Amino acid sequence: YAKLDRVVYRDQTTRANLGATLTTKDSRNYLNDQFLQVSSRDLTVLDLDGSLSTRLFGGVLMMEAGLAQGLDTLGALSDPANLPDTAPHAQFRKYKLGLNYQYPFSVFGQEASFSSLFSGQHAEDVLYGSEQMLIGSLYSVRGFVRNTLSGDHGYYWRNELSTRIPLRFGDTT
């Protein structure tokens, strides 16, 4: 893959970045050592992203927005002219948005923090699995460890309160 990233603005509290990434994705699937042609594909994706981080109300706000475009280049699968709208597209377009706010505070002298994370995407086309949004891990939805959900469009919003609780073993902490 190839990546360009540039800081376009910076001051004491704010930083803005713009970036572009060109990625080739080579998917090879097998079942019992048998190559599965129908579910194996090569995709080329151009991602254009922007991000901003700034201090806000005593915390830190991070925002990311992006566009991903599937390209017909560098050996990628090419969509046929008569491809139905219900079939996955190698030449696709999807939009991504991420917001994250972290706020440190203290309660009765104990340090704690609040974080709120929003992540979402919207696709104009049906996507192959490698491009779909996937939720179902400790990092997206608590309690979703064994099961996952995926789709062309989706979002999740996760809020978290955390603090450190010291454990004491005898005379040591």
Report the location of each language-model feature.
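Phosphate/diphosphate-binding loops
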Residues: 1
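C-terminal outer-membrane beta-barrel translocator/porin domains of Gram-negative envelope proteins
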Residues: 26-172
